């Protein structure tokens, strides 16, 4: 059947750069982002529960940002210190001392500005695509399955002649979900997701780790690159009438602009509460944790974490 989706959001965000190392270093530049999206798809059953379809979509992302000027500020403090003035207190003094120790680099404090200057990408990016997909679905319930599998492979093409901001590029995604009842009230849910881009995408079209569904506990987009793979296992247990709890563990990788290395694997784990407000429809409250941040940066020393609240299961 036909599916239409449209979205428009205006929100504060952050950009850490592209690649695993950029995310690990923890330098972030604040953005005020305007995003709009429209997607349409049509599919038909080929055999039984196997479907094929076509899709199309338009994405727009605009970013407003300011440079921190940290390099000039550090140089200014250094000049004052050399003239006999004391190192200032507070955050600036701490960063100055870290800079002198080689543990802080003010030139990396504005990763979005650096990315735009280096790549020639535009802060306001328009992308349009056409695509094909195939899926196989034996789930008993789409939004809260207790048994069955879901497999979807989709290829999208973003040709330059459709008005794309960057050069022509392509994107392939693969989703594999498995659900199995265990004992009374218990379901084991497994998820595998892969995302690969060919060519040069716009800054907001890289595969992004984190968010509401996968690698919960990470800020979505802190780790982004041309290739991504994520997997998670979740145990869902109903405990009393409409109330339930869950626990999960997962792992993932981003690479592409940098080489794949097993040592760059990131972990995610957490727990959550479920309230069934309608039959097989849950309110979801999750708290997820990830890896620790850059211990050299005052704002990034804690373990990555996030509280999530929504009205559907993660997968």
What does each of the following model-derived ranges do?
Residues 6-13, 64-72, 145-147, 163-169, ...:
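Outer-membrane beta-barrel translocator domains and adjoining extracellular loop/strand segments
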Residues 41-47, 135-139, 177-182, 236-238, ...:
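Structural signature of outer-membrane beta-barrel channels/translocons
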Residues 55-59, 68, 135, 152-156, ...:
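Transmembrane beta-strands of outer-membrane beta-barrel proteins
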Residues 212, 273-276, 280-281, 285, ...:
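Outer-membrane beta-barrel "beta-signal"
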Residues 32-38, 124-130, 147, 166-172, ...:
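Residues that define the transmembrane beta-barrel architecture of outer-membrane proteins
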Residues 48-52, 141-143, 183-188, 241-245, ...:
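Repeated loop/turn-to-beta-strand initiation elements of outer-membrane beta-barrel proteins
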Residues 114, 120, 130-133, 139-239, ...:
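C-terminal outer-membrane beta-barrel translocator/porin domains of Gram-negative envelope proteins
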Residues 1-4:
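Short, small-residue-biased leader/transition segments that mark boundaries at the very start
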């Amino acid at each position: 059947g036909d599916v239409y989706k449209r979205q428009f959001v205006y929100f504060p965000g952050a950009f850490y750069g592209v690649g695993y190392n950029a995310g690990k270093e923890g330098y972030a530049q604040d953005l005020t982002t305007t995003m709009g999206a429209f997607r349409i798809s049509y599919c038909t059953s080929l055999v039984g529960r196997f479907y094929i379809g076509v899709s199309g979509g338009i994405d727009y992302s605009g970013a407003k940002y300011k440079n921190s000027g940290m390099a000039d500020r550090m140089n200014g403090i250094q000049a004052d210190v050399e003239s006999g003035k004391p190192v200032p207190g507070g955050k600036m003094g701490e960063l100055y001392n870290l800079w002198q120790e080689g543990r802080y680099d003010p030139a990396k404090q504005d990763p979005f500005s650096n990315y735009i200057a280096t790549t020639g990408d535009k802060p306001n990016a328009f992308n349009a695509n056409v695509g094909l997909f195939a899926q196989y679905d034996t789930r008993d319930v789409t939004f809260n399955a207790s048994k069955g599998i879901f497999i979807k492979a989709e290829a999208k093409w973003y040709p330059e002649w459709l008005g794309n901001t960057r050069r022509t590029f392509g994107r392939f995604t693969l989703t594999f979900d498995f659900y199995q009842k265990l004992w009374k009230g218990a379901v084991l849910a497994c998820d595998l997701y892969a995302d690969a881009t060919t060519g040069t995408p716009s800054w907001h079209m890289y595969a992004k780790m984190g968010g509401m569904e996968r690698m919960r506990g990470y800020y979505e987009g802190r780790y982004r690159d041309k290739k991504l793979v994520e997997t998670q296992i979740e145990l869902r247990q109903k405990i009393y009438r409409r109330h339930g709890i869950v626990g999960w563990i997962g792992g993932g990788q981003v690479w592409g602009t940098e080489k794949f290395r097993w040592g760059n694997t990131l972990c995610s784990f957490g727990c959550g509460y479920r309230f069934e407000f309608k039959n097989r429809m849950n309110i979801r409250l999750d708290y997820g944790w990830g890896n620790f941040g850059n211990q050299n940066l005052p704002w990034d020393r804690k373990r990555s974490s996030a509280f999530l609240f929504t009205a559907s299961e993660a997968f």
